[in-house]
């Protein structure tokens, strides 16, 4: 694990310990199980692709460790509604506070403002966070292979699937890809950003295409900044995208989405 990932994971364990002291796991799990309003994340993406369109997971993100604040005037509900109007398949909402200036309320606000399925984007290392995700309204979670061993990934996936949530597993290299393929989820994200160096290259996705089984729904993540990037991916039969920074810097994120995928 890179230094930044080690720091983030250590922070997560501290946050979870504090949260558990405030509210027990059983109470949280009961609240999560009581929610029956799961929106179909995978289904929304497959519907876009079946219609010949790009399936865009549009990100609601105020800041990042590498770029700092991306959007000063940050209004999650307005951003979510704009994304929905302009063709997003799903949302991804950052809930990490320390490194991305996110929070659970941002996810709640974004989800309440639209009918799109919502991914809780955070660094998931404990089942407590998965129950927390469903309790706050998330329809899907992200598992980052670089942060987890095989047993942890399988355990967290099982908790999410028990809540009828979708799971997007994120990889960056071939070793992580092979580990991810042992999971049940068909949703596979390839992050074009090296989490050790923060360098971005679309060749990361393109170089692994031949090793991705046809039953997996591949999502390319990071580095999609222009229409030429989109065209390059779609020419390689990659039709699902997770995009954040390019939209967050635009005056109207939804208009930027429509322009990028026109």
From Swiss-Prot:
Keyword Lyase present in the record's keywords: the answer is: yes
| GO BP terms, alphabetized | L-tryptophan biosynthetic process
Keyword set, alphabetical order: Amino-acid biosynthesis, Aromatic amino acid biosynthesis, Decarboxylase, Lyase, Tryptophan biosynthesis
Which CDD domains does the annotation name? IGPS (cd00331)
Q: Would I find Lyase among this entry's keywords?
A: yes
Full protein name: Indole-3-glycerol phosphate synthase
What the record says about family reads:
Belongs to the TrpC family.
What HAMAP family does the record tag this protein with? IGPS_B
Q: Which PROSITE patterns match?
A: IGPS
Enumerate the Pfam families for this protein: IGPS
Q: Which organism is it from?
A: Leptothrix cholodnii (strain ATCC 51168 / LMG 8142 / SP-6) (Leptothrix discophora (strain SP-6))
Gene3D superfamilies noted in UniProt: Aldolase class I (3.20.20.70)
Which pathway is recorded for this entry? Amino-acid biosynthesis; L-tryptophan biosynthesis; L-tryptophan from chorismate: step 4/5
Top EC class of this enzyme: lyase
Q: Which reaction does it catalyse?
A: 1-(2-carboxyphenylamino)-1-deoxy-D-ribulose 5-phosphate + H(+) = (1S,2R)-1-C-(indol-3-yl)glycerol 3-phosphate + CO2 + H2O
This enzyme's EC code(s): 4.1.1.48
UniProt-recorded Gene Ontology molecular function terms: indole-3-glycerol-phosphate synthase activity; phosphoribosylanthranilate isomerase activity
From the UniProt record, list the coiled-coil ranges.
none
């Amino acid at each position: 694990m890179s230094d930044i990932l080690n720091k983030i994971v250590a922070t997560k364990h501290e946050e979870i310990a504090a949260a558990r002291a405030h509210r027990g796991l059983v109470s949280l799990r009961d609240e999560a199980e009581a929610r029956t309003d799961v929106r179909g994340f995978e289904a929304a993406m497959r519907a876009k692709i079946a219609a010949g369109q790009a399936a865009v997971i549009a990100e609601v993100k105020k800041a990042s460790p590498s770029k700092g604040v991306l959007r000063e005037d940050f209004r999650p509900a307005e951003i979510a509604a704009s994304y929905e109007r302009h063709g997003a398949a799903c949302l991804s909402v950052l809930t990490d506070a320390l490194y991305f200036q996110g929070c659970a309320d941002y996810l709640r606000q974004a989800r309440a403002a639209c009918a799109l399925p919502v991914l809780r984007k955070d660094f998931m290392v404990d089942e407590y966070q998965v129950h927390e995700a469903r309790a706050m309204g998330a329809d899907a979670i992200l598992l980052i292979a670089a942060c987890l061993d095989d047993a942890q990934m399988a355990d967290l996936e099982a908790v999410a699937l028990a809540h009828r949530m979708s799971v997007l597993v994120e990889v960056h290299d071939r070793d992580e890809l092979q580990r991810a393929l042992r999971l049940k989820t068909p949703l596979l994200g390839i992050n074009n950003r090296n989490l050790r160096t923060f360098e971005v290259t679309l060749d990361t996705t393109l170089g692994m295409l031949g090793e991705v089984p046809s039953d997996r729904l591949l999502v390319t993540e990071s580095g999609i900044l222009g229409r030429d990037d989109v065209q390059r991916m779609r020419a390689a039969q990659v039709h699902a995208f997770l995009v954040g920074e390019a939209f967050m810097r635009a005056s109207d994120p939804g208009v930027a989405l429509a322009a990028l995928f026109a």
